[in-house]
Regions:
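Short beta-strand segments
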Residues: 13-48, 66
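Short, structured beta-strand-loop surface elements
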Residues: 47-109
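Short, basic/aromatic recognition patches
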Residues: 1-17
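Flexible glycine-rich active-site/ligand-binding loops centered on an Asp-His dyad
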Residues: 102-133
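A generic local structural motif
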Residues: 2-5, 29-30, 50-53
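Short solvent-exposed loop/turn micro-motifs enriched in small/polar/acidic residues
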Residues: 11-13, 26-27, 81, 96-98
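A short local loop/turn or secondary-structure capping micro-motif enriched for an aromatic residue
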Residues: 37-38, 50-54, 121
């Protein structure tokens, strides 16, 4: 459901930030690597099972927020990004370094900004919201 501009942006980004909540309802944000397969985001990594985002998901806190952003330009100021609210689940899959666990994030709602066609004024366009099925 992402546009071609959004997909190209996702492919070019090496990092995302994931927000989860712990048992005390304390939000926490961590930088993570990610992959997007067209339907779900995968978060993996070395010793994933020891990370806060993994432990929070194991504890049943499956609602997450994922942010992928950058600055296209400082002058003029041109921030761009994609924010996803979704559901995380732990999956076991074959990764780059062999079998292991990962967090699979299924988007429920996403917003993007700064992905406008050249010549389009961002202030008039506003964030693009997608409700995922």
């Amino acid at each position: 459901m992402f546009s071609e501009q959004e997909l190209a942006f996702l492919r070019a980004q090496p990092l995302a930030r994931i927000a989860t909540v712990d048992n005390e309802e304390q939000p926490t944000v961590d930088a993570v690597g990610f992959e997007f397969d067209g339907a779900r985001f995968s978060i993996g990594g070395h010793q994933l099972e020891t990370t806060r985002q993994y432990q929070n998901s194991v504890a049943g806190h499956c609602k997450v927020s994922l942010l992928i952003d950058d600055l296209k330009s400082l002058r003029p100021w041109q921030p761009r990004g994609i924010r996803i609210h979704g559901i995380a689940e732990i999956v076991h899959r074959q990764g780059h370094l062999g079998p292991g666990s990962s967090l699979a994030i299924t988007p429920r709602v996403s917003w993007s900004w700064g992905m406008e066609e050249p010549g389009t004024e961002p202030a008039k366009v506003g964030p693009r919201k997608i409700i995922w099925q």
